Amino acid sequence: MSDYKSTLNLPETGFPMRGDLAKREPGMLARWTDDDLYGIIRAAKKGKKTFILHDGPPYANGSIHIGHSVNKILKDIIIKSKGLSGYDSPYVPGWDCHGLPIELKVEQEYGKPGEKFTAAEFRAKCREYAATQVDGQRKDFIRLGVLGDWSHPYLTMDFKTEANIIRALGKIIGNGHLHKGAKPVHWCVDCRSALAEAEVEYYDKTSPSIDVAFLAVDQDALKTKFGVSNVNGPISLVIWTTTPWTLPANRAISIAPDFDYALVQIDGQAVILAKDLVESVMQRIGVSDYTILGTVKGAELELLRFTHPFMDFDVPAILGDHVTLDAGTGAVHTAPGHGPDDYVIGQKYGLETANPVGPDGTYLPGTYPTLDGVNVFKANDIVIALLQEKGALLHVEKMQHSYPCCWRHKTPIIFRATPQWFVSMDQKGLRAQSLKEIKGVQWIPDWGQARIESMVANRPDWCISRQRTWGVPMSLFVHKDTEELHPRTLELMEEVAKRVEVDGIQAWWDLDAKEILGDEADQYVKVPDTLDVWFDSGSTHSSVVDVRPEFAGHAADMYLEGSDQHRGWFMSSLMISTAMKGKAPYRQVLTHGFTVDGQGRKMSKSIGNTVSPQDVMNKLGADILRLWVASTDYTGEMAVSDEILKRAADSYRRIRNTARFLLANLNGFDPAKDMVKPEEMVVLDRWAVGCAKAAQEDILKAYEAYDFHEVVQRLMRFCSVEMGSFYLDIIKDRQYTAKADSVARRSCQTALYHIAEALVRWMAPILSFTADEVWGYLPGEREKYVFTGEWYEGLFGLADSEAMNDAFWDELLKVRGEVNKVIEQARADKKVGGSLEAAVTLYAEPELAAKLTALGDELRFVLLTSGATVADYNDAPADAQQSEVLKGLKVALSKAEGEKCPRCWHYTQDVGKVAEHAEICGRCVSNVAGDGEKRKFA
């Protein structure tokens, strides 16, 4: 028997079947670094239109987790897809480097500043610690395949950035947005510092719920208001609170002007309550026998005075819009030093902003004899006992409610009035302008707009001062007596900024005021406060984007972070940019959900359901992690588990196998010499290129819309359905058996080449390592890296006017599917082994029959059978299988006649008819020793 294997064009490529990504990716990264791939991309894109995605800085503390990976991978996909879309899209990664978490880490190791180390030495230790954290996180981010200027990231602790943060504050002061006040702020007694809104988390807490009677000073005036004379016992206004410890700071009782308030007679006394809450209050305090003596509107009670239950003063009834009928009594205990609503109404009525609580959460001396020095959370029982003793306690019970806690310590926090610096939301119209700016931004998903609008509309003034050691100094001088800012504040801040730019923030603490104030130095003091770290990161649009040369003065097009950043970085950036420049710092804001496990549970070390990105990369490779991110709808929670990652790995194999098939069959193809013109190509090959063109249109649209899961789905459909189960199957016969240099084969290779050129680019933003690997095996002259180019523009398709247009082949796909069903059944029944052992007759109605007949003898190649004939639908025998998809089609199968050709494996009647090649069929003889077969359609 002759060996005809050597006459076949068998696929051959050095591109490995197995990805072995965990082993192979580090080598690629080393090459990218050695070549300065990021620099090559920047040079290639120079002068193009820009797209700037500004990196929200992760905090420089701890290893990266799966959420960090999601964030950086999404950014990288966008940057790379924008590059392929013709944009110059630089990526400058950043880190947030100041603040409490770093201080706490350094304290754990070295103690608090002033104990073993001076404050200056402590700051130096903080800077060292942050630098080591940046280095660790940077290695992991690079390992993810994220391309960026990793050698020159921005750090909020860079001297120049620290200086520019001071300048940003100066601009805000110059625009009139800063004010000082003793105002209640979120205060953590463990941190001994004010907290930003974004540093507050809510947990369930059990607190005492109490109803307290405030005795009326002028009993007769109240009787007159309610139009009654016969009242049994004293009259009180009743408040309800879950924070008894705040009662020493009570300075008023708030009621609603339009609510009806009832005077209710109970045993031995009368109480004033909101009429709509009388029944629920009576049930709560256990009173069944009561009488409503009269009602008045809340406005009638304004400025009537009531005796504080245990402090030696009385307080007014005041009118407030914050009073509701949701719970309580309709009268609200008001302590301006312990709550933002209380503070606002207190300002309106000129109330004292009393703050009897020290920074450590204990009452200050002189508050009340039994309370001085007591922790406020331990004081509730003392206050309740006092109320009981004074006869003012109507009811007490325990209740569980959501309570604000410190994000770092997870301990309850308090509202505490302290002298702080604020960015005002309203004194210069910052709130109104911010709300206007929000409308000009594209929010992705669109619900982000309503979310941040609500937050801006309702947020208090922003407390930007902190009493910390490791932070950017506010760099302010205030008068010793008046506490007013120095009249040359902006000029002085610029002088400080220049020094910080040279020596870092320590320059402020080393600064002797005389150096820049001269003779005035004795009249002014340096403000010791540092800036909220959210001010650091929130001002990077100014301190980084506006000054980095690669951004060339362009504002950021996009901010992209987790959905918690509406109240974090998106908010602080919007506030600062609007206060500085009157406009938003971004054009688009994209948010992604949090990662959860396969059961939808939050990631938790205690549950043991965390997924380490480092483990995934070491086991499966970064491309699998990237594919999981891209294939998950990031607009909601993003589920990840070993099983989910395994599915991503399965999808990866399908894409890799498709790429490998293309490369293996491009063996020996030189596009410069072997390319077939579109008009001379086999029709099916043109259809395949057209499929790629249609897929590319969908994929590019999805990239443009940031719908990456749609990119993956479309890519998978192209690889699995249009290519894998149809086109690539059909062309194997022609590719392997036709003459090597025949039009039939070169046409096929031309199609595969166009498809591969497109496919590798579709993959590149997501499967960056694999795309780089594929790129290295593609034939023809090309740039060194896929990332420097643009989307492939060599695709074309069939014209609708052609007889065998896309609709024709779509119908052939369905016919092929129906034939496959019949063949599978015949294989199950042991009638045939493989499809080439079968011959089929297609009984079709005239319109379909005409299409099938048009393919002539090439129909069998489309169906992967040794024989295929077309007959009239009405002539179908009883055992012909009716198609469920195509009503005008029945399929009958028989065993193919003739002998099996050992070269092409088709069964034909002409095997052995040519004496010189007695073992093979006539078609193979032509391909081996003759002019070669001609293919027109398939």
UniProtKB/Swiss-Prot annotation:
Keyword terms: Acetylation, Aminoacyl-tRNA synthetase, ATP-binding, Cytoplasm, Ligase, Metal-binding, Nucleotide-binding, Protein biosynthesis, Zinc
Disulphide-bonded residues: none
EC number of this enzyme: 6.1.1.5
Residue sites binding L-isoleucyl-5'-AMP per the record: 561
Binding residues for ATP: 605
Subunit text: Monomer.
Protein name: Isoleucine--tRNA ligase
Organism field: Escherichia coli O1:K1 / APEC
